[in-house]
Amino acid sequence: ENPAFKNYSLKDFTVDVLDQLKAVDIEEYLEYLKVYDTTDVHTKETKQVTNSERGLFRKMSALRSFYNYFFKRQIIQKNPTLFVDMPKLHDKAIIRLDTDEVAKLLDYVESCGSKLTGQALSYYNKTKERDIAIITLLLGTGIRVSELVGLDLSDVDFNNNGVMVTRKGGSQMVVYFGEEVEKALRNYLETYRKAVTPLAGYENALFLSTQRRRIGVQAVENMVKKYASQITNKRITPHKLRSTYGTALYKETGDIYLVADVLGHKDVNTTKKHYAAIDEDRRRSAANVVKLREP
């Protein structure tokens, strides 16, 4: 806490206070935000709050925007936030499934019924083909979970083996799939989807929940987590399956522009940032490709 404002209540703060703060005050505030105690106004309980690199970055961005608003309008004379460096953001390692883990996951979803009994077995048998189709589609195309749950029956084209997805921003694009995805989708449509009568308004939805409505994002996230937790300690989400696909495609083709296009990245630099580590592996392996002398 800044001792100069220790006895201030919220109503005591005016715009003039902004001119009193210095860059060192902002730096001390950022340091404070890393770990601090706060008291719940209702329960009066004290708990510890921490902020990650991204949390600190967001708060500093908000503070800069706040100061810029008053500074540009000449309401205040100083902007100390300009003299404080933005918190550094370190790239997170991409979490994805290895090739053997992909096979284990699909095998597990197809056969785990032998380990279940009672109600759990009944639920599994009911949703098995749907779950296999969803996980296979995510792994085989790299589409976002939001794109998957938005698919309609009419979006699937078996003549060209593609699905019409609605990307971020509303643009549409055909994403193509292979034989494994085709087989999983056909099995689902002939079993679970054909056996379920959708509720009114959901007749066109490709993937249905057990409540006969369009399946939701959270339901897919929970389903992926349920199966993946049985074959790996990694925290696997639908987005991690997307990363798994992107990694596999890049390793096979080495074409970052193709990967960016298929994944629906508007900026190829986004793709480059995510798969830079793979580039490093490729460069390292290249060191042994050229032989200076015959052994």
Predicted regions and their residues:
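Conserved catalytic core of the tyrosine transesterase superfamily
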Residues: 1-295
